[in-house]
Every structure is written in C-alpha cells, then in structure tokens.
Design a protein with these regions (language model features):
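P-loop NTPase catalytic phosphate-binding loop
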Residues: 1-28, 33-164, 183-253, 257-271, ...
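Juxtamembrane/interfacial segments at transmembrane-helix boundaries in multi-pass membrane proteins
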Residues: 165-169
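Conserved alpha-helical scaffold flanking the Walker A/P-loop in AAA+ ATPase domains
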Residues: 171-183, 214
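Intrinsically disordered, low-complexity mixed-charge segments
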Residues: 314-317
Length: 320
C-alpha cells in the first residue's frame, strides 16, 4: 500500500468518524414540535447580549435546545412563509412582544397590517403604534407611501447632521439646536405584514415597487419590514421582493417548491408544523428550531403594562 492509499484510507476514516459524531449530536436535537407552548420569556430571557440588540426578536429554541434571539435591525428585513395555521402569526406575536417589553415608544414604533381584522385585536391602544392597526388594503397602500416619504425625510436629516445611519444619528454626543425642528433622536420603525398576499392581489405593482424601494434603502433610516404570507407563488413573493428580504423564516409548507420560495432550499415541507421552523440569516446556514409561544393572556398583560407605563399612543398625522 503506497502513501496515496494510506491518505485515502485516513480520509475515509475521518469522514466516517464525522458522520458518527453528527448522528450522536442529532440524538440530542429537538425533532418534534412541543405543542405545550414555549413561553418566550422562559426560553429566551432578554438579558445580557440581547438587551443590547436594537430590535430583539425571540425566535424560539434551536435543534439543540439553545434559545435563539436575533436582532432584527441586523437582518435587516424578514420574509416569513408557511402553510395556514403553521405558526406565522404566533411568530409575529413573539416579535411584537419582545419589542414592546424591552423598548419604549421613543425607541421603536410599530406599523401592523392585519387584513383578517381579528389577529391583532389584542394590540388595542398599544403606545408603540405609529398608526392604528391597518385592516384595509387601500389604507395600507397609503401607509406605505407615507413610509417612503418618512424614509427620505430621515435620510436627508441624517445627511444634514453628517450621520450615515440611525445609530450614528441617535448616538450624537453633542447636539446643537439648529432651530429647524431636528429631533434629538428618532425611533426605529418596524412594519409587520400579517398576510401580504391580499395586498399584492389588489395593488400588486405599486406595492411591489414601494416595498422594494423601502427595503432597499430603509436600513440606514431605521425602518425594518417583516413580510408574512401563506401564498407562496411568484405573483406574491416576486424575485424583486425576495432580493430585498434577506432574512428568511419558513414554517411547514405544502411542497418543496414552496420551501424553495422562502428559503431557497428544500426542507420546510418536512417540518412537523406547530411552530417548527427553518431560519436563515442572509447567506448563513439553515437553523431548525421550535418557535416561541405567548398566550393571549400574556399578550394582553404586556399591552396593559405598556399603556400603564407610557400612556396612550401618539399616532402620526398621516392624511390620505
């Protein structure tokens, strides 16, 4: 046996050992959905590193039981997809809960699109809302136009202050009052689409243009968009939209084609449902996990606590 044969044998042994190690590691993985529900405050306490996140988002636990909390501001936008009843709205509830429990309305404001009219009744008079929960397509289209103008206004204001982004602007050490109404700080804005398909069906081209324009430029302005949908065809999730939504979160899909639409890979069709997800941040590897769950009672308590602490919402004066 010459040296080449020995090297080949060693490589084969190393490969076999790696496979065994992976199988042993897989034995400790979370391989079935935990239907009892995982309270976000229990599985991913927002302390330490997560408290330094601009926009903390509790996803859940990964395959090995490790809590998974990400910073939405770093994604900077997210596409959420999966079949009906597989965990998308519960996931968005977790996002909102994490934001309102750690950030004040001066730090983050929310815009929520709820075409079903019933998914976000629990939000009520949440002080973090920048506008009342939006339930009509025409109103959401107007809100997107307003958001586009707000983005441009912020970027011009940042440039005038010699700042490249919202972090630089809010972190200015010395601020001289220019007398032009420039605020000391501005809040992040998180826009949540609970079901994007309805809007694309009625106002497809303009919505695609606006959302693509905003997502392409809004990171510096502190505006972040989360698009969720159960309709995963090319008329709803277009190539232009996908290119500007680098964060991907897939719940169980009907087919491998739907899986590829969300995460550019197969696998979501084999998930169990009930919050079982695959997550990819930009070009990183897929991470499987079990989504966080917060009960309606807990959500109501969070809203009541926010109202008690910050008062009633101060909506923007956006006129149609």
């Amino acid at each position: 046996m010459d040296n080449r044969d020995v090297i080949a044998k060693l490589r084969e042994c190393a490969k076999n050992l790696l496979e065994v190690a992976r199988e042993m590691q897989a034995a400790d993985r979370v391989e079935s959905p935990q239907t009892a529900g995982l309270i976000a405050s229990e599985i991913a306490p927002l302390d330490g590193k997560a408290h330094n996140f601009a926009l903390p988002f509790v996803l859940g636990r990964d395959e090995f039981g490790t809590s998974q909390t990400i910073d939405l501001a770093l994604l900077p936008h997210l596409l959420v997809g999966g079949g009906a009843g597989r965990g998308k709205t519960v996931c968005l509830n977790s996002l909102i809960a994490g934001l309102i429990s750690t950030k004040s309305p001066d730090e983050v404001r929310l815009m929520i699109y709820d075409p079903k009219c019933v998914e976000y009744t629990w939000v009520g008079e949440l002080p973090h809302l920048i506008l009342p929960v939006i339930t009509s397509d025409s109103r959401m289209l107007f809100a997107l136009r307003w958001l586009d103008c707000e983005m441009e206004k912020r970027l011009k204001m940042f440039a005038k202050s010699y700042c490249r982004n919202i972090t630089d602007f809010n972190g200015r050490k010395f601020v001289q009052d220019a007398g032009d109404g420039t605020p000391r700080t501005v809040p992040y804005i998180v826009v949540v689409f609970d079901e994007f398909a309805d809007l694309m069906t009625t106002h497809g081209k303009e919505v695609e243009t606006l959302v693509s324009r905003i997502t392409a430029k809004a990171r510096a302005a502190g505006i972040h968009i989360v698009v969720a949908t159960s309709r995963l065809d090319c008329k709803v999730v277009t190539g232009l939209l996908k290119s500007n939504l680098p964060g991907r979160l897939a719940f169980k899909t009907v087919s491998s084609i739907d899986s590829r639409t969300i995460i550019d890979d197969v696998g979501a069709e084999n998930l169990y449902g009930c919050g079982d997800y695959l997550f990819r941040s930009s070009s990183e590897e897929l991470v499987r996990g079990q989504g966080a769950y917060i009960s309606d009672v807990e959500l109501g308590q969070l809203v009541s606590a926010a109202i008690g602490k910050y008062g009633q919402p101060k909506y923007e004066e956006a006129k149609e």
